[in-house]
Regions:
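Membrane-interface helix-cap regions at the ends of transmembrane helices
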Residues: 30, 34-37, 41, 55-72, ...
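Specific transmembrane alpha-helical segments of multi-pass solute transporters/efflux pumps
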Residues: 26-27, 31-32, 60-110, 146, ...
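Glycine-/small-residue-enriched transmembrane alpha-helix faces in small-molecule transporters
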Residues: 2-49, 92, 152-179, 200
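Transmembrane alpha-helical segments that form core, pore/gating elements
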Residues: 55, 59, 117-119, 123, ...
């Protein structure tokens, strides 16, 4: 049963797709700054399993309330890939990276996310894009890797490598999820992926939990709450609704705004420095992503 999940009153027409899509991107843009705050008091491993467990329990309730049909064996395998990418892989690797670099620095790598998603869509879907696609793909990656190498001499090569791996596995999860959503439904994909991971996340959460929660700051709790409720679940509801209302090709372009929004949040909320180099590389990556999307089919 593929139902529309209503957290807010739906907005009719193409405008609703753009509005819902923008809300989804705005929510995702706060993920890295919120993670940065949370890992001050929580370990990256506990933060990863805690956010997955909280979101997974909520997702299970939603699936039961809406009486969604269980996925078949093939879909379960695909959902496992989604879970490895966006439920475990990206959250864990990015949290580990943020122990070494600022959220503003890490957000530069998010500019590659649409590109890695497109690359895995090509590999998984067997598409044969225009040769210009690969030119933009290589150029965009060179911007980020080049900047990371230069900055890594004074920042942290470990953090850069972890963020690069995070973006790669997230791109795989996004591509597999987009492919699966055609048959399973949009919000149902992330919900089932969370539920599949739940039996592993909950026990692990108890094993790696802090020895005491008395010293945990309010900011860390807020960060955990944000990545659990918004980044892991609610953001996907708005995002997939926007894609359905306004079209994947059109509304999907809003993802290009995420690095700019993320840098703005890092600067205003965390008071992190956003250098001219960060902005330049982000703009360069976004232009390359836009070019790769144009020739991606």
């Amino acid at each position: 049963m593929n139902r529309e999940l209503s957290l807010t009153k739906p907005i009719a027409g193409n405008a609703g797709g753009w509005i819902n899509g923008f809300v989804g991107v705005l929510i995702f843009s706060g993920s890295l700054p919120a993670t940065r705050v949370a890992i001050i008091d929580f370990s990256p491993v506990f933060l990863t399993v805690a956010r997955a467990s909280i979101a997974g329990l909520l997702a299970l309730c939603l699936l039961l309330i809406y009486k969604e049909k269980r996925p078949n064996r093939q879909q379960v395998f695909q959902l496992a890939i989604v879970a490895m990418g966006v439920v475990v892989g990206y959250p864990l690797l990015s949290a580990l990276a943020l122990q070494y670099v600022t959220s503003a620095h890490s957000i530069i790598f998010v500019g590659m996310l649409p590109l890695t998603t497109a690359l895995f869509a090509v590999l998984r879907g067997g598409e044969r894009p225009h040769p210009a696609f690969w030119v933009f793909a290589i150029l965009g990656s060179s911007f980020v890797i080049g900047y990371a190498v230069v900055q890594g001499l004074s920042v942290s090569p470990i953090g850069d490598i972890l963020m690069l791996l995070a973006v790669i596995v997230c791109g795989l999860g996004y591509a597999e999820g987009a492919k699966l959503s055609k048959t399973l439904g949009g919000w149902q994909v992330i919900s089932w992926a969370l539920v599949i991971a739940l039996p592993f996340m909950v026990p692990l959460g108890f094993m790696v939990r802090p020895s005491s929660f008395t010293g945990i700051s309010t900011a860390a709790w807020v960060g955990l709450g944000y990545v659990s409720l918004f980044s892991m679940l609610i953001g996907f509801v708005f995002w997939y609704r926007g894609l359905a209302q306004g079209g994947i090709a059109a509304v999907g372009q809003l993802q290009l705004l995420q690095p700019f929004l993320g840098l703005a949040l890092a600067a205003t909320l965390l008071h992190e420095t956003v250098s001219l180099g960060m902005l330049s590389v982000t703009i360069g990556v976004i232009l390359c992503v836009a070019g790769s999307k144009k020739f991606g089919k």
